[in-house]
Amino acid sequence: MSHGTYYECEPRAGQQPLEFSGARAGPGELGDMCEHEASIDLSAYIESGEEQLLSDLFAVKPAPEARELKGPGTPAFPHYLPADPRPFTYPPHTFGPDRKALGPGIYSSPGSYDPRAVAVKEEPRGPEGSRGASRSGYNPLQYQVAHCGQTAMHLPPGLASPSQPLRVLKAPLAAAAPPCSPLLKAPSPAGPSHKGKKAVNKDSLEYRLRRERNNIAVRKSRDKAKRRILETQQKVLEYMAENERLRSRVEQLTQELDTLRNLFRQIPEAANLIKGVGGCS
C-alpha cells in the first residue's frame, strides 16, 4: 500500500528509479519529497497544559468582509496583525436639527470601537417637545390648507425649536364657496340672524303675553295628565268590581255543578225502586 505523499512520475535522465524492496530510504530522500508541506511542532503545546497556547494555536483568521465592518483603522486581532499605518478619518456627518453626533468620549484607545460615527436622535421631553415633534412631522391640516387654498401657512425657519408657535394666517373666504373639509369649516358668526331668535325685552307686552301663553299651556298639560290619572284609577276600580262579580259567579256555578252531579248519581237507584214497587203491586 503506497503512502499518500508518494507520486508516480516519469524517470529523468540522470536519476535512478526508486526501489521499494523493503530497504529503508535515507533521511535526505524523504525530506526532499515533502518540501512543499508545512509542519507544526506540537511538543511545546502538548507538554504545557495552558489553555491560552491552545487557543492561540487554533485561532481562526476572520474573513475579510468581517474585518471591513470594523473600519480599516481597527484590526480584528491586535496581538497578531499590525495596525494600518494609514490614518483613517470618518467623513463629516450632516444631521438634521434634531440629531447630533457624539463627541469624544471614553473610547480613546486604538483597539476600541469608536461610537462617534453613530448618530443619536434626541427624543423631545415634556409637552412642549411633543408638540414641536408633532409639528415637524406630517400634518394633515397643512395638506388640507394647501389643497383648498383657503388659508396660508407661514412656517418660520426655526420651526424645529419647540418654543416657537405655529402661525396660521387666514385669508378672506368666499361666501358662496362651501368648505372642502369638515375640519376647515369656518365657525358661524354669532348674530341674531343665524340663531333664529331675537332679543326680547322682559318688560315688554309681547314677552308677558308669551309667558302667559306658556303658563296656560303648562297648566293645561298638567290638568290633562291629572284627568288621565283619575280615569285610570276609575277604570281600575271598575275592573276590580267586575272581577269580584265574576268570582262570585264562578263559585255559584261550581255549587250548581256539584248539585247536578249528586242528582245524576241518585237517579238509577230511584228507577230501581220504582220498578220494584210496580212489580209488587
UniProtKB/Swiss-Prot annotation:
It comes from the Eukaryota. The gene is CEBPE. This is CCAAT/enhancer-binding protein epsilon. GO terms for biological process: DNA-templated transcription; myeloid cell differentiation. Residues 208-228 are annotated as: Basic motif. Belongs to the bZIP family. C/EBP subfamily. Binds DNA as a homodimer and as a heterodimer. Can form stable heterodimers with CEBPA, CEBPB and CEBPD. Interacts with GATA1 and SPI1. Interacts with SMARCD2. GO terms for molecular function: DNA-binding transcription factor activity, RNA polymerase II-specific; RNA polymerase II cis-regulatory region sequence-specific DNA binding. Residues 230-237 are annotated as: Leucine-zipper. Residues 204-267 form the bZIP domain. Transcriptional activator. C/EBP are DNA-binding proteins that recognize two different motifs: the CCAAT homology common to many promoters and the enhanced core homology common to many enhancers. Required for the promyelocyte-myelocyte transition in myeloid differentiation. Its main location: nucleus. Keywords: Activator, DNA-binding, Isopeptide bond, Nucleus, Phosphoprotein, Transcription, Transcription regulation, Ubl conjugation. The modification Phosphoserine is found at S181. The lineage of its organism: Eukaryota, Metazoa, Chordata, Craniata, Vertebrata. The keyword Repeat does not apply. It comes from Ovis aries (Sheep). GO terms for cellular component: nucleus. The keyword DNA-binding applies. It is found in: Nucleus.
